Amino acid sequence: MTPHLMKLLGLSAALLAISQGVRAEDVKAPTFSAEPCCQLCPEAHDASRYTTRYQQNFTTLVQAQGDWLFRTREDLRTEFNTTPAGYKRLQQVHDAFKKRGVELVVVYQPTRGLVNRNMLNPAEKAAFDYQKALGNYQAMLKRFASMGYNVPDLSPLTNEQLAAADQGKDFYFRGDQHWTPYGAERAAKIVADTVHKMPAFEGIPRKEFETRKSGRMGKTGTLHNVAGQLCGTSYAVQYMDQFATEPKGASGGDDLFGDSGNAQITLVGTSHSGKNYNFSGFLEQYIGADVLNVAFPGGGLEGSMIQYLGSEEFQKNPPKILIWEFSPLYRLDQETIWRQILGLLDDGCDDRPALMSASTTLKPGKNELMVNGKGGVIKDLINRNLQMDVKFEDPSVKVLQATLWYLNGRHEDIKLEKPETSDTDGRFVFQMREDEDWASQRLLAFEVQGPESGTQKVEAKLCKRNNFAVPAQTAQAGQ
């Protein structure tokens, strides 16, 4: 409370006393006590208290300067890598896009610890091995590049120390994992430099864009929210400038029906690419070309990628350049993600013969959809050669739960979930499992879990797939 406000309150109390017949000199000025706001409680330092799936993304919170919070597992990580299987899949994805004539740009965000470590308190700052983290982050960028990806180096944005005039324009929010619009802009400038050097950019039509402030947004941070759940505290809303980008010379909604539908650069990514941060707008401004943004909030690592690859837009008009933005918090060895992405890049079972197929109405419980040998002949259906294409009549279906049975009695339970925020078409495409010794398994049957109540129409096809070869030396990267 400011001294000025305290004086006003004291004067008000005195006037009230006078009106009640009491002498002002007998009235004491009000007293106030101020406690430090929002220091984390002991529970926030106990990983076992992070019980929900959502809370476990924030294990464990660390109080920093002011309202700044950090996560020890994600923000203060020093390791940036994946498993040999993850590197192999990344190579396959690159090669699959290359076959489609698409060049990939990987925007691998630096962590909040790398960028805003100067906001840590002295003890935590000393404990965080910044040099190790930075070295490993840069090594991961080189690994992406060694596989053929175009990789903007965002490491110059680390160890941020803003000038006095730029205070409040931090790269990341104080209590949220997202970058601010100012952070998005700084990243976009570096990404644009990388795009300009790509041969694929040479034939892309140029266009001038300009960006203006469009208002202010209030950010209730996700880290602050979790701290509130654990400690019962609340943090102040952080207000930040918002921006909008439009073609130079345009006004209002002039570009609503412009040629952005013919963009030859597409952005897929996480909620960092959402409208609030204007990352796609800054990309348009600094690249100097239309960018189609298909990212959506809550999409995670793969949500917008899978939705886009299954779209008519990608199938008929694949971009020359695909910018893929994601953060190090996502594991890059999640087999079910790569199986879906590679299956969609191979067009599922569109326009190719089905080795097995079925169309039926599902009932609650397990439904036997396809059986190898039902016609009297058992086919040699080996996992490494196959992919599955499942289509529900109801496009709003976002979960496929199924069981794949094999001739030797083994089975795989698979569950594919699309984000609640995604615009789905009811289609699920995935390659058959090939990690460990699954590649040589021979398929016997395919069961699908039906709805909780009522019925659900579905059709499924099993077909041969293309194999995207991986050079042996690249598949071993990171070992």
From Swiss-Prot:
Keywords: Acyltransferase, Alginate biosynthesis, Disulfide bond, Periplasm, Signal, Transferase
Annotated metabolic or biological route of this protein: Glycan biosynthesis; alginate biosynthesis
GO BP, sorted A to Z: alginic acid biosynthetic process
A GO CC annotation given for this chain: periplasmic space
Classification via Gene3D superfamilies: C-terminal carbohydrate-binding module
EC category: transferase
Active site residues per record: D176, H178 (proton acceptor), S271 (nucleophile)
Signal peptide feature range: 1-24
Superkingdom of origin: Bacteria
InterPro entries found in the cross-reference section: ALGX/ALGJ_SGNH-like, AlgX_C, AlgX_C_sf, AlgX_N
Disulphide-bonded residues: C41-C231, C349-C463
Region of interest: SGNH hydrolase-like domain: 24-349
Record-listed E.C. numbers: 2.3.1.-
Subcellular localization(s) per the UniProt record: Periplasm
Stretches the record annotates as CBM domain: 350-476
Molecular function terms, GO-annotated: acyltransferase activity
Function: Plays two roles in the biosynthesis of the exopolysaccharide alginate: protects alginate from degradation as the polymer traverses the periplasm, and also plays a role in its O-acetylation. Probably has acetyltransferase activity in vivo.
Note on domains (UniProt): Consists of two domains, with an N-terminal domain with structural homology to members of the SGNH (GDSL) hydrolase superfamily and a C-terminal carbohydrate-binding module (CBM) that may bind alginate.
Similarity field: Belongs to the AlgX family.
Assembly notes: Monomer.
Record-given protein name: Alginate biosynthesis protein AlgX
